[in-house]
Amino acid sequence: MTEHLPASQVSFDENALIAERRAKLLALRAQGVVYPNDVKREHYAADVQAAFANVETWTAETLEASSHRVRMAGRLMAKRLMGKASFAQIQDESGRIQLLIQSNVLGEDSYAAFKVLDVGDIIAVEGGLTRTRTGELSVKVNVLRLLTKALRPLPDKWHGLTDVEQRYRQRYVDLIVTPESREIFIKRSKIIRALRTWLDARLFLEVETPMMHYIPGGAAAKPFVTYHNALDLELYLRVAPELYLKRLVVGGLERVYEINRNFRNEGVSTRHNPEFTMLELYEAYSTYHEVMDLAETMIRDTAQSVLGTTQVIWDGAQIDLGPIFRRWRMDEAVCHHNPEISVAECTDRDALLLHCERLKIKVKSSYGWGRLLLSIFEATVEHTLIQPTFITDHPVEISPLARESDIESGYTDRFELFINGKEIANGFSELNDPEEQAMRFQKQVEAKEGGDDEAMYYDADYIRALEYGMAPTGGLGIGVDRLVMLLTGSTSIRDVLLFPYMRPER
């Protein structure tokens, strides 16, 4: 028999199964054999499978004649009772391997104890190796111990964890039963490690900056508010580390980066989570053109390092990170996708208002031409940018921390990287003129007083830092979660966060 229930019965029978397992645990407690902590694991499933993969060399006869023995531990994932000989599968962090369990090898008492184990229990086994008639490598078990009794049944193996919300809420179950989820999070770890390795090799210094700020800044976003009792002080969870990292550049740390969490009190979607991971870096004596080169090379090299290729499929689109990424001015992109809009109209507020009305784009009366241009870009261009594309030269109005262009007034030396219609990175030549920065902060304050929750606060200490002098600097922010989505082909940010934000269960 195989211990699995039809999906339709799982919910109905779960309480009964839990009660049955608790009864087994009670009996085990009476015997004093629960939750031991002295197991010595020496081998992993994937290593054993790889070492003895050659079927011609390692036949059942050669395996049983050899002196190879394994000591393994893992979760019991399947159990098939067949009289005096049974089969089972255990799973460890590396994979699965089959167990051959025979009463004449294991012993009658231990075999009887095995028969009452449940799928989900964690066990330790020892034994030699053999191969079944179907050619499957198996551990011929002669020692078996229960390490942890599982009181809740795992989802049915044929249907798995089909409730997406349950997968997110109970990630611990998802990781047990969904190999694809495990692989995503293993890749996530490798991606972050590859980013660090890439930057460290180029002499960037990894730093840590505060997670709680007196004044939220560094991004146009609504912050979470908290309170420090001892200091009697309202604080904000950071929306970005930017202003602290640039203070470090002022202090002479010319190449710095941070990979850490940001918090934004905004909506939840397939692309947004209130708590998310960002890579942010700054390099003195660098321009936004050089930062674009850096971002492009780092993303391409990370894909090659982790995936072994620069080609990925994301949400049905074939993405190639190998060729040079396209660079396209925002106003040119808007005009290309909206031929009725001329380049001259891109800085004409009244003309852009009429175009927004024609395109049925909702805007606020407080918007200047820069924010109106962005609104048209987001509605008509952004979703069309499938292959990697840098959208450059953003208006000053929407770029309060970026340096204004020397070539064209009203625009900045800024870029955003889009892949498959999603923003992956943002960067610019940093504004290092303290008087200009103070003026832009003041405009942000006026916007906030006018009802813009995402406008920035005035940070007087940051202005003071700039007054000591900051070298010409290029900065970059990469959404790590979205980069992981790209490199794992995931369509929702929740699929790449171990514990995404969810409403509390009722």
Curated annotation (Swiss-Prot):
Its EC number is 6.1.1.6. It catalyses: tRNA(Lys) + L-lysine + ATP = L-lysyl-tRNA(Lys) + AMP + diphosphate. Its cofactor is Mg(2+). Mg(2+) 1 binds at residues 416, 423. SUPFAM superfamilies: Class II aaRS and biotin synthetases, Nucleic acid-binding proteins. Its main location: cytoplasm. InterPro entries: Aa-tRNA-synt_II, aa-tRNA-synth_II, aa-tRNA-synth_II/BPL/LPL, Lys-tRNA-ligase_II, Lys-tRNA-ligase_II_N, Lys-tRNA-synth_II_C, NA-bd_OB-fold, NA-bd_OB_tRNA. One of its GO terms (biological process) is lysyl-tRNA aminoacylation. It is found in: Cytoplasm. The keyword Nucleotide-binding applies. It is an enzyme of class 6 (ligase). Keywords: Aminoacyl-tRNA synthetase, ATP-binding, Cytoplasm, Ligase, Magnesium, Metal-binding, Nucleotide-binding, Protein biosynthesis. Binds 3 Mg(2+) ions per subunit. One of its GO terms (molecular function) is tRNA binding. Transmembrane segments: none annotated. NCBIfam families: lysS_bact, PRK00484.1. This is Lysine--tRNA ligase. The lineage of its organism: Bacteria, Pseudomonadati, Pseudomonadota, Gammaproteobacteria, Lysobacterales.
